[in-house]
Amino acid sequence: MSARSPRKGLTFSPGNHQYRLDGKHVPGVTTILGVLDKAALPKWAAGCVAEYVADDPDAVETLRSLGRKGMVNALKEIPWKRRDDAGARGTTLHDYAEKLLRGEEVDVDEELVPVVESALDFLEEWEIEPVLLEFAVASREHWYAGTGDLIARYRRPDTGHRGVGIFDWKSGKKVYPEAVWQLNAYAFAEFHGLAGDEHPVPACDGAFGVHIRADGFDVSPGAFGPEIFDEFVAIRRTHEIAKRGRGDWRTPGSGHLGIAIQKGTAA
């Protein structure tokens, strides 16, 4: 009996957010960009814990019942819970936006009504006509995958320019610079489509991060073109180097740093 040939094409598992290309694991764009230093992250995490302690002293006292170790572990989780909550809100916004673009009715939670109204204002003011919605992309040459939010025809209200752009919805504090490399990676991928149903990514002339807020929206144009994509490819290479250098944390010595030759008791 002959061995089964690898599955052709791109697949995505939402549960663990893993991509596979032609049967092999392939890193996602956001994972690749994670190799970049985020200098503000430690300050943000410390701020989350500090705000929690200052704003809810009764809850802090309750945590003391867990003992020192339990209390420390609970406080350490606060930034990541806030991140996960924000991620859930972002997913909800993406779902609403996709339905609005498809012309479907949306049943909106009351607290999110202002955000959805801001999204509608953006779609109207920029005269958005969707070309691709929530689309998976990949590159065999550079070995990466990802999921874009929107490619659409648009009209810039500030200049009147009409074109086809790639857009990314953002619901956090702002649009970060990494979004530019993210959008270029999606736009210059080799194909879009899952399970072997592969098509060229529509040509775009611009990239935009769309920050939707309850009181309005911001659209941030990003640098766009082959030279910016080349920068992403360099980051992809850096990600691969860092992965090899660090090795598998479960296997000491699997990276570039060998197993320590110990004398005495290790700390």
Model-derived segments and their meaning:
Residues 1-145:
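Metal-dependent nuclease catalytic cores that hydrolyze phosphodiester bonds in DNA/RNA
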Residues 109, 137-237, 242-245, 251-263:
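Nucleic-acid nuclease catalytic cores
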Residues 1-13, 18, 159-160, 248-267:
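Glycine- and charge-rich intrinsically disordered segments
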